[in-house]
Structure formats: C-alpha cells, structure tokens
Regions:
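Sec-dependent bacterial lipoprotein signal peptides
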Residues: 1-4, 13-46
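Short, flexible beta-strand-to-coil junctions
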Residues: 3, 104-106, 115-117, 162-165, ...
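Short, charged/polar, Gly/Pro-enriched secondary-structure boundary elements
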Residues: 36, 107-110
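Signature of long, low-cysteine stretches enriched in small and polar/charged residues
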Residues: 126-183
Length: 218
C-alpha cells in the first residue's frame, strides 16, 4: 500500500526588527501620499479664492456746475464754482491779491498769486519756466495752450502735466503785459495717483477753463 508523501511544513516567517521597520515605512509613505492628495484636492477646490481681485476705485460724486462772480479782490475778478470757497492766502497776509480757491470735497485747492509788472515781465516768465521744469522730472508728459483774450487784455499760458507723483497737474499764468501778472496752480493735500484722480482732474479742468474765460482786470 502506497502512502501519500506528506508535504514538508514551511516554517512561518518570523517578524524580525527589519520587517517591522519596513512595515512602518510603508505605512508612513501611504499616509504621506494620502495627505498630499488631500491637500491638492483642497487647493484645486479653493483655487478661485486665491485669484487676485481687479483693482477698483472709490466712487467720487461730482457736484453740479454752477458759478458765482468773485469781485472782492483788488486787482482782478473771475467766476468761481459755487462748491468752492475763496479765502485769503494764510501764509501771505500782506499780499491782498493772493487767494486760495479751496475745494474740500476733493482735498485740493487752486493757489493764485499776483505780482505787479514794472518792466520785469520776463523775470516772472522765467520763474514760471523754472517751476514747470522742476515738476517735469516726475511727469510722463506735458501739454500747453495759449490764452488770448483781446477784449479784456488777458494773455497767458495754460500748462497740464500727466504722471503719478506730479505735485501740480495743472497751472497757468495770466498777464496784461504792462501792469499785472497772475499765476495759478492746482494742488492736492495728499500725494495723488493722477490715474485714479483723473475724473476729478478733468472736472476741475473745466472750472479752471471757466475761471480763465471770465477773468478780468480792474
């Protein structure tokens, strides 16, 4: 009678220190992979939250156009917007013909100075040229236009400068060439970003044009 040969018993693997370390490494790798996948999935799901938002500006309400005659200055008069306030220059109390046109809602003002002409008109024109040249260092561009009003003997130049950091985006001078010389300049009480302030600058430009067109000597 033949007997079936018995299979030899295979010894069970003994869990040694090396096997335990390998198992721990495998579990760590699996856990790390799960964490990475979860982080990627969360990042993709919230991707829209990290997109940069478009730049915006505060809305600026512009007042209605209306003007009144300013006739309290000794040497000249003009029409001024009703939303503005004309005040004497606080830093030059002895100069009765120096005024500020204050625009508090825009945090700006137009400074107007007056000088008498006694054969020295070229000196005043040179001063204007020097001041404009200083501002040009921060300007991207400059444009100017002649002012000619033969009826009221008002002649001059209007100067406009573009660019961030320009201290005065608009200035002008007026003269009758024999007795009077007036210079005006727009300033803001903060460092303006002229790009974002462009609607206000354009609005004030219209008021300066009106001031020049209604300017008269006394």
């Amino acid at each position: 009678m033949l007997r079936q040969a018995q299979q030899p018993k295979v010894p069970e693997p003994v869990e040694g220190p090396t096997n335990r370390i390998n198992m721990k490494i495998s579990k760590f790798i699996i856990s790390l992979a799960i964490m990475v996948l979860a982080f990627i999935a969360a990042s993709c799901g919230n991707e829209a939250a990290y997109l940069p938002k478009p730049r915006g500006y505060f809305r600026i309400d512009l007042p209605e156009k209306a003007y009144t005659r300013v006739d309290t200055i000794e040497r000249y008069s003009f029409e001024c917007p009703q939303y503005a306030l004309v005040t004497p220059d606080p830093y030059s109390p002895n100069e009765k013909n120096w005024v500020n046109i204050e625009m508090p809602q825009f945090k700006g003002s137009i400074h107007i100075t007056h000088k008498s002409v006694n054969g020295n008109l070229s000196e005043y024109l040179e001063d204007v040229h020097t001041m404009v040249t200083k501002h040009l260092q921060k300007a991207n561009g400059v444009s100017d236009s002649l002012i000619v009003n033969d009826e009221h003997h008002v002649y001059g130049l209007f100067i406009e400068m573009d660019g961030k950091g320009v201290a005065t985006p608009m200035q002008f001078y007026l003269t009758d060439s024999t007795r009077n010389f007036v210079r005006g300049a727009l300033y803001f009480n903060f460092k303006p970003d002229n790009d974002s302030m462009q609607p206000v600058i354009n609005f004030i430009r219209q008021d300066i044009d009106h001031l020049i067109n209604t300017f008269e000597w006394k």
